[in-house]
Amino acid sequence: MHNLVILGASGSIGQSTLKVLRHNPGRWQVLALTAARSVEAMLRDCLEFSPRFAVMVDEAAASELAAQLKTHGSATRVMAGPAALCEVAAHPDAHSVMAAIVGAAGLAPTMAAVRAGKRILLANKEALVMSGAFFMEAVREHGAELLPIDSEHNAIFQCLPEAIQRQPGFCDLAGAGISKILLTGSGGPFRYTDIGELAHVTPAQAIAHPNWSMGAKISVDSATMINKGLEYIEARWLFNAAPEQIQVVIHPQSVIHSMVQYKDGSVLAQLGNPDMCTPIAHALAYPARVESGVEPLDFFSVGEFSFIRPDYERYPCLQLAMHACQQGQAATTALNAANEEAVAAFLAERIGFMDIARVNEATMLALGGTAAGSLDDLIALDGAARARAHNLIEELS
C-alpha cells in the first residue's frame, strides 16, 4: 500500500485530495493528515481515513482533537506544533507527500520531505518562489521526485517529453525542441471591470472566482493576477526556463490549463474542466491514470476559446512578479512575503484592493537587492519583508 502524507488537509487542495482518494479506495493509505487549527474538519477526516498521525499546528487545537478522537475510540496519534509537520513529512513510512500548506508556512515541512527523498506533490508554490535555487538543489541532492499540482504546471508537465518529466528543474528546454511555455490564466473576476472601479473592490467580490473553487487567499491572488506571477516564477524553477521562454496568456474559459510550444510549430495543450481533482489524480498516480471524479470535458458546451494579452495597468502585481523573477531570489522572496501580508490586510478590510500592489512594490524595492547566500538568509529576509509590509499597511490603514 502506498502511504500518503497530506500537509494542509483541511484546505482546498487537501480536501480535493481526499475526494480523489474516495474515488480510488484501497489504492492509498493515509499515513498523516495535518492542519493549523480546524478541529471539526480534522476529526471528520481522521474518523473516515484513520491516519496513523494527525498534526495540528495549534497546540490547543491538538489537545481538543485528541480528546474528541479518544471518545470515538480512534487509534490516531495526535501531534502538535510546526516541528511535528516536518516529522511526519519525513517519516520513513511515507512514500508521497502532498505539500498543500498555503504560504511560507509550508516551506519547512516541504523541505523536510525533500531532504528525506520523498515523492513531493507540490501544491505550495511559495516553496519555489521563496527558495527556488536552494529548493531545487535539495531535490537533486536528496533524490526527491517532484510532481507539480498547480493546474498550470501540471498541464505543462503533461505536455513535456517524458525525459524532461523525469528531471524537471534541470532540463534543457531548447535542447528538447521547446521554444516557449504558454502559462494560461483566467484573468480573475475583474478582467472586464473598469480600471477606475478596482480601487473600490471588496473582499467578497475578490474571492468570487468565476471558474475555480479556491480558498480566500489564492482567490484574491487570482484577482490581482499575482497568482499567475508566482506561477511564472515557479515555472522558471520547475522547468529550468529563462524568462523569455515563458509567456502569460489570459484564457477566460479556464479549459486550456497551459501549453507548450515546440520549435517545429506544434503546440501541445492540456485541457479539462476546471477542477483541481484532475491534476491531483494525475500526480498521485503518475505515470498511471486513475479516476478523479471530474466530469469529462464537453466541447460542445464550451463552444469557443478566447485569448487576451495581459494588461499590466489592470494587473500591476503580475508585472511586479515578472520583474522580481528577472531580478533574482531576494526579490521574489520579498514580494511573496509582502503579498501574503497585504492580502491578509485586504481580507480584513484594512487596505484597499489596489493597495496590495503598492505594498508589494514598495517592499520589493526596499529589500529586493538583499544578499541571500543560504536558506536561513532567505527566511530572515522573509521576516524583514513582512515587517516592512506591516509598516506600509499601517500607513495605508
Swiss-Prot record:
- List residues binding Mn(2+): 150, 152, 231
EC number(s) reported in the record: 1.1.1.267
Major enzyme class: oxidoreductase
Alphabetic keyword roster: Isoprene biosynthesis, Manganese, Metal-binding, NADP, Oxidoreductase
| Record carries keyword S-adenosyl-L-methionine | no
Q: What does this protein do?
A: Catalyzes the NADPH-dependent rearrangement and reduction of 1-deoxy-D-xylulose-5-phosphate (DXP) to 2-C-methyl-D-erythritol 4-phosphate (MEP).
Similarity-based family = Belongs to the DXR family.
Q: What is this protein called?
A: 1-deoxy-D-xylulose 5-phosphate reductoisomerase
The source organism is: Aeromonas hydrophila subsp. hydrophila (strain ATCC 7966 / DSM 30187 / BCRC 13018 / CCUG 14551 / JCM 1027 / KCTC 2358 / NCIMB 9240 / NCTC 8049)
Q: Which gene encodes it?
A: dxr
